[in-house]
Amino acid sequence: MIYPLLLSALPLLSSAALTYRGADISSLLIEEDAGISYKNLNGETQALEDILVNNGVNSIRQRVWVDPSDGSYDLDYNLKLAKRVQAAGMSIYLDLHLSDTWADPSDQTTPTGWSTTDIDTLTWQLYNYTLDVCNTFAENDIDIEIVSIGNEISSGLLWPLGKTSNYDNIAKLLHSGAWGVKDSNQATTPKIMIHLDNGWDWEEQEYFYKTVLATGSLLSTDFDLMGVSYYPFYNSEATLSALQTSLTNMQSNYDKSVVVVETNWPVSCPDPEYSFPSDLSSIPFSAAGQEEFLEKLAEVVEGVTDGLGIYYWEPAWVDNAALGSSCADNLMVDIDTDEVLESVTVFEDL
């Protein structure tokens, strides 16, 4: 049995202990087109990527949609964003949704024009897609650090063929997508990630990986990283101690590095739909609370063997401050002034 460590007993971290101190700023170009100009802590207008890198962020996550109706988050959109990210000196992590729209546990719609009836055809389409994405980035002299084959795929991917009613299909798809990345012309092969939701729920993580690897169609050598989402405002059981147990078990059972790839903490949450986890209940809903939460989360991740990093999800999406939650504001930007909050400095110490 693996016993969760007492959080209070975790050692203090040295500066910049995590490999990836990241943020997902996928909506940046859309926000700028809407007229938003971000301001640094001195109140001066500055490009968001420069504000972030100056405060310790070293990696940016970007969601990629296949063929969205309005071009949002498509390949061209992400090339524009990635060029700015790379120029600012940060690494790039592509979160491939493998859909024309949002992909998450409730919806994994196959892109228009991809097969929904033949798994062999679909695996080749996925292989060619991940190959093309990586090669297009290479042609534009953009290096990719991480590629996630799907987004929050605990319920499968590329439905209906990739539903959890057929884990062998899921395994074939993950294998095919991974090899498109491996066969690409990227100067250094990007790290390949599988990303599930509810990172605090070890039973959910264990069932998925045990089942998909048991098919034999996905090999442990096909991927490098296990990514998880960890949101404290959707379930009172999502404690830091539960997360630590889950990440520890994931790493020790599968010998993979682990990353928390989505997380948030609110500056305003007057009417939460769910109770917050017990070991987080003392943290205030404020910029100071964001710092405290991320510091505690970093302690958990750093305390796990091969715990590599944290990515804060959409800290500057001013037009969507709730970020899909019941909390009013989870941003690191003041929604009235577009100036970043003091909490942005926490990345320097993670």
UniProtKB/Swiss-Prot annotation:
The set of disulfide-linked cysteines is: none
Q: How does activity depend on pH?
A: Optimum pH is between 4.0 and 4.5.
Write down the chemical reaction(s) this protein catalyses. Answer: The enzyme specifically hydrolyzes (1->4)-beta-D-galactosidic linkages in type I arabinogalactans
Protein family: Belongs to the glycosyl hydrolase 53 family.
Q: Does the keyword Transit peptide apply?
A: no
- This protein is called Arabinogalactan endo-beta-1,4-galactanase A
One GO BP: cell wall organization
The record's active-site residues are: E152, E262
Q: Which residues form a coiled coil?
A: none
What is its induction behaviour? Specifically expressed on arabinose and galacturonic acid.
The signal peptide here is: 1-16
Assigned keywords, A-Z: Carbohydrate metabolism, Cell wall biogenesis/degradation, Glycoprotein, Glycosidase, Hydrolase, Polysaccharide degradation, Secreted, Signal
Question: Gene behind this chain?
Answer: galA
User: What is the main EC category here?
Assistant: hydrolase
Q: Which residues carry a glycan? A: N128
Q: Which SUPFAM superfamilies match?
A: (Trans)glycosidases (SSF51445)
**Which EC numbers characterise this protein's activity in its record?**
3.2.1.89
**GO MF annotations, alphabetized:** arabinogalactan endo-1,4-beta-galactosidase activity; glucosidase activity
Q: What is the lineage of its organism?
A: Eukaryota, Fungi, Dikarya, Ascomycota, Pezizomycotina
Biological role stated in the UniProt entry: Endogalactanase involved in the degradation of plant cell wall polysaccharides, and more particularly of hairy regions of pectin.
InterPro entries listed in its UniProt record: Glyco_hydro_53, Glycoside_hydrolase_SF
- Asked if Disulfide bond is a keyword of the record, the answer is no
